[in-house]
């Protein structure tokens, strides 16, 4: 019981998490379109990379939720691949001071995830690092919201990642961020938006035809600031429209983290 309570504090609300040392640059317009985040202002953001032909390649984002666990999307994970995690990094091509590359020892995909039925949800996975990392000004853990939290319509959040700058476009070398407004479930699940593809275990944000996540942002965080100034990861980038990354009334869809707090704590406690 004590161990469970300690884990809950660590991944769901410890005061040491969610307060970046380096200030977040507010009101940056878009990930699609290529607006650079302030270096190390999202210190829980990681790059999940796979090995191919002797080289490492960025495939997805993720969030450090404990000193040896990363939260990402289930669709990012393949058991046939070898992965590593880059932490404390702004530029993917530069060996920056204070950054780390850590091997992966375990992959845990949600047991109800079905790659053939993305709209069912449960697009969530945990990646265990081969060794714990020391927390610094450039590498910090994310805070997760209280279980069951539902953000109101038009709540401002930021999506971050190294995904494409536009539909079928180039990928950036440095971390991008984009401000998105939450779209409530009633709106997002309406016929002219996402319809039945969206479930209550998801969060929608964006849909204005300008700002969105894109390919390569998958698994990364939807960062939303609480009234006390603490940043919390409310979403995991899951899917977008095949019509384009920033298609009107097709907001970015995220796994709703607050629906999975018990699952996250359970996986970490058992592993």
From Swiss-Prot:
Which biological process terms from the Gene Ontology are attached to this UniProt entry? insulin catabolic process; proteolysis; regulation of insulin secretion; regulation of platelet aggregation; response to insulin
**GO MF annotations in UniProt:** endopeptidase activity; serine hydrolase activity; serine-type endopeptidase activity
Keywords recorded for this protein, A-Z: Disulfide bond, Hydrolase, Protease, Secreted, Serine protease, Signal, Zymogen
Q: Which residues form the propeptide?
A: 17-30
Which residues are responsible for catalysis?
75, 123, 218
Its job: Elastase that enhances insulin signaling and might have a physiologic role in cellular glucose metabolism. Circulates in plasma and reduces platelet hyperactivation, triggers both insulin secretion and degradation, and increases insulin sensitivity.
Cleavable signal peptide = 1-16
Question: Which SMART domains does the entry link to?
Answer: Tryp_SPc
The reaction(s) annotated as catalysed by this protein in its Swiss-Prot or TrEMBL entry are: Preferential cleavage: Leu-|-Xaa, Met-|-Xaa and Phe-|-Xaa. Hydrolyzes elastin
Family the entry assigns: Belongs to the peptidase S1 family. Elastase subfamily.
Cellular component per GO, a single term: extracellular region
Q: Where in the cell is it found?
A: Secreted
EC numbers for this chain: 3.4.21.71
Subunit architecture: Interacts with CPA1. Interacts with SERPINA1.
- Its gene? Cela2a
Q: What is its main location?
A: secreted
Q: Where is it made, tissue-wise?
A: Pancreas.
Its top-level enzyme class, in one word, is hydrolase
Disulfide connectivity? Answer: 60-76, 157-224, 188-204, 214-245
Question: Where would I find the Peptidase S1 domain in this sequence?
Answer: 31-269
* Protein's UniProt name: Chymotrypsin-like elastase family member 2A
């Amino acid at each position: 019981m004590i161990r469970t309570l300690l884990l809950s504090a660590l991944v769901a609300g410890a005061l040491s998490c969610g307060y970046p040392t380096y200030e977040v640059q507010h009101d940056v317009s878009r990930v699609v379109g290529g607006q650079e985040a302030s270096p190390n202002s999202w210190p829980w953001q990681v790059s999940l990379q796979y090995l191919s032909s002797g080289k490492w390649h960025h495939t997805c984002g993720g969030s450090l939720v404990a000193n040896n666990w990363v939260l990402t999307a289930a669709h990012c994970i393949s058991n046939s691949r070898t992965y590593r995690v880059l932490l404390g990094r702004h530029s993917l091509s530069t060996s920056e001071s204070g950054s780390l590359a850590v091997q992966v020892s375990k992959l845990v995909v949600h047991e109800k995830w079905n790659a053939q039925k993305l709209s069912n949800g449960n697009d969530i996975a945990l990646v265990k690092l081969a060794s714990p990392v020391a927390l610094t000004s450039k590498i910090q853990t994310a805070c997760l919201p209280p279980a069951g939290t539902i953000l109101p319509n038009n709540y401002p959040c930021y999506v971050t990642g190294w995904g494409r700058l536009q539909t079928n476009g180039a990928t950036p070398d440095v971390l991008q961020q984009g401000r998105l407004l939450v779209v409530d479930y009633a709106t997002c699940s309406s016929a002219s938006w996402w319809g039945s593809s969206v479930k209550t275990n998801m969060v929608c944000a964006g849909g204005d035809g300008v700002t969105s996540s894109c390919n390569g942002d998958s698994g990364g965080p939807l960062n939303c600031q609480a009234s006390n100034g603490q940043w919390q990861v409310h979403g995991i980038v899951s899917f977008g429209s095949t019509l384009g990354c920033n298609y009107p009334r097709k907001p970015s869809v995220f796994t709703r983290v607050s629906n999975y707090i018990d699952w996250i704590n359970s996986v970490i406690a058992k592993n």
